[in-house]
C-alpha cells in the first residue's frame, strides 16, 4: 500500500452501491406487482437484498471509520455537508406532496363537489390518534437531544437510556400509524384526498421506519463502544435525520390532519 500524504479517505471499490441500486429496482417493481397482481415475492426479495446491502455497507463504514481511522476531521466535514444536502433534497421531496395537497384542496374541482374534504370522505379526527402521534414524535425529539448531550458529556448510561426511549417512541408511532391506516374509512384509491393523504403520510411513515433503523444501529454501536464524546458523526447524522422527520410531521399534522379536515 502506498503512503498517503493527505487526510482524505480514498474509498476502496465496493459492490454495495450496485446491490443497493438493484434492491431499489426490486422494491419498486415489487410494489407494482403487489398493487396490480397481489404478489409479494418480488417485494420480499427487494426488502431482503436491501437489508443485506445496508448491513454490509454499514459494516464497511464502521470498519473504516472506527477501526481503520479513515474518518479524519476533514472527512467528517465532507460527511456533514453530504448529510445536510441529503436532508435538503428530502425537504424538496416532501414539498412535492404538500404542493399536490394544497393544489387540490385550495381550489376543489366540481368533480369533488366543490368542497374540501371531498363529498363522501370522512376525515380522521385531528384531536385523537394524530395528536397523540404528534406528542410522541415531539417527545422523541427531546429524548434524542438528551442522548446527544449525554454522549458529548461522556455519560454512557444516560445516552443508552435516552436512545432506547427514542427507539421505543419511534416504534410506538409506527404501530399507531398502522392502526390508523387500518381503521380509516377511506383508502388510497378514494380520489385525490385518499391519494395525497396516504402518499404524504405513508412516505413520512417510511422515513420514521428508516430513522428508527438508523437509531437501532447507533444503539448497537454505542453498546460496542464505537462512539466517543468528540467522534460520533454516525449518531449525529441519525439525530439530524430524526429531527427532520419530527419537523415534517408537524407540517403534515397542521396541513393534512388539522386544516385539511
From Swiss-Prot:
Keywords: Membrane, Mitochondrion, Mitochondrion inner membrane, Translocase, Transmembrane, Transmembrane helix
Membrane topology: Multi-pass membrane protein
Main subcellular localisation: mitochondrion
SUPFAM superfamilies cross-referenced by the UniProt entry: Cytochrome c oxidase subunit III-like
Mitochondrial intermembrane membrane side: 35-40, 106-128, 184-190, 257-261
UniProt-listed Enzyme Commission number(s): 7.1.1.9
Residues in compartment: Mitochondrial matrix: 1-15, 67-72, 153-155, 224-232
Domain of life: Eukaryota
The protein's enzyme class: translocase
Catalysed transformations (reactions): 4 Fe(II)-[cytochrome c] + O2 + 8 H(+)(in) = 4 Fe(III)-[cytochrome c] + 2 H2O + 4 H(+)(out)
GO MF assignments: cytochrome-c oxidase activity
A Gene Ontology term for the protein's cellular component: respiratory chain complex IV
Keyword Lipoprotein: no
Subcellular location: Mitochondrion inner membrane
TM region(s), chain numbering: 16-34, 41-66, 73-105, 129-152, 156-183, 191-223, 233-256
GO biological process, one term: respiratory chain complex IV assembly
Residues forming coiled coils: none
Gene3D superfamilies hit by this protein: 1.10.287.70, Cytochrome c oxidase, subunit III, four-helix bundle (1.20.120.80)
Entry function: Component of the cytochrome c oxidase, the last enzyme in the mitochondrial electron transport chain which drives oxidative phosphorylation. The respiratory chain contains 3 multisubunit complexes succinate dehydrogenase (complex II, CII), ubiquinol-cytochrome c oxidoreductase (cytochrome b-c1 complex, complex III, CIII) and cytochrome c oxidase (complex IV, CIV), that cooperate to transfer electrons derived from NADH and succinate to molecular oxygen, creating an electrochemical gradient over the inner membrane that drives transmembrane transport and the ATP synthase.
Family: Belongs to the cytochrome c oxidase subunit 3 family.
Quaternary structure note: Component of the cytochrome c oxidase (complex IV, CIV), a multisubunit enzyme composed of 14 subunits. The complex is composed of a catalytic core of 3 subunits MT-CO1, MT-CO2 and MT-CO3, encoded in the mitochondrial DNA, and 11 supernumerary subunits COX4I, COX5A, COX5B, COX6A, COX6B, COX6C, COX7A, COX7B, COX7C, COX8 and NDUFA4, which are encoded in the nuclear genome.
Protein name according to UniProt: Cytochrome c oxidase subunit 3
Recorded name of the encoding gene: MT-CO3
Amino acid at each position: 500500500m502506498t503512503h498517503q500524504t493527505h487526510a482524505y479517505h480514498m474509498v476502496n471499490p465496493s459492490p454495495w452501491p450496485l446491490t443497493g441500486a438493484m434492491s431499489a429496482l426490486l422494491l419498486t417493481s415489487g410494489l407494482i406487482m403487489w398493487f396490480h397482481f397481489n404478489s409479494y415475492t418480488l417485494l420480499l426479495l427487494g426488502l431482503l437484498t436491501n437489508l443485506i446491502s445496508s448491513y454490509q455497507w454499514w459494516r464497511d463504514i464502521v470498519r473504516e471509520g472506527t477501526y481503520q481511522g479513515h474518518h479524519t476531521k476533514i472527512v467528517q466535514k465532507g460527511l456533514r455537508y453530504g448529510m445536510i444536502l441529503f436532508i435538503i433534497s428530502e425537504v424538496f421531496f416532501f414539498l412535492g406532496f404538500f404542493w399536490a395537497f394544497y393544489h387540490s384542496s385550495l381550489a376543489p374541482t366540481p368533480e369533488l363537489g366543490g368542497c374540501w374534504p371531498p363529498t363522501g370522505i370522512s376525515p380522521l379526527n385531528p384531536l385523537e390518534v394524530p395528536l397523540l402521534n404528534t406528542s410522541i414524535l415531539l417527545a422523541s425529539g427531546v429524548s434524542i437531544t438528551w442522548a446527544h448531550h449525554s454522549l458529548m458529556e461522556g455519560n454512557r448510561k444516560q445516552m443508552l437510556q435516552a436512545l432506547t426511549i427514542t427507539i421505543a417512541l419511534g416504534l410506538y408511532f409506527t404501530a399507531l400509524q398502522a392502526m390508523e391506516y387500518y381503521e380509516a374509512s377511506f383508502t388510497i384509491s378514494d380520489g385525490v384526498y385518499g391519494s395525497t393523504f396516504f402518499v404524504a403520510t405513508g412516505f413520512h411513515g417510511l422515513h420514521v421506519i428508516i430513522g428508527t433503523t438508523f437509531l437501532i444501529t447507533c444503539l448497537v454501536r454505542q453498546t460496542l463502544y464505537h462512539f466517543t464524546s468528540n467522534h460520533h458523526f454516525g449518531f449525529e447524522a441519525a439525530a439530524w435525520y430524526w429531527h427532520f422527520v419530527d419537523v415534517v410531521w408537524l407540517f403534515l399534522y397542521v396541513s393534512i390532519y388539522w386544516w385539511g379536515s
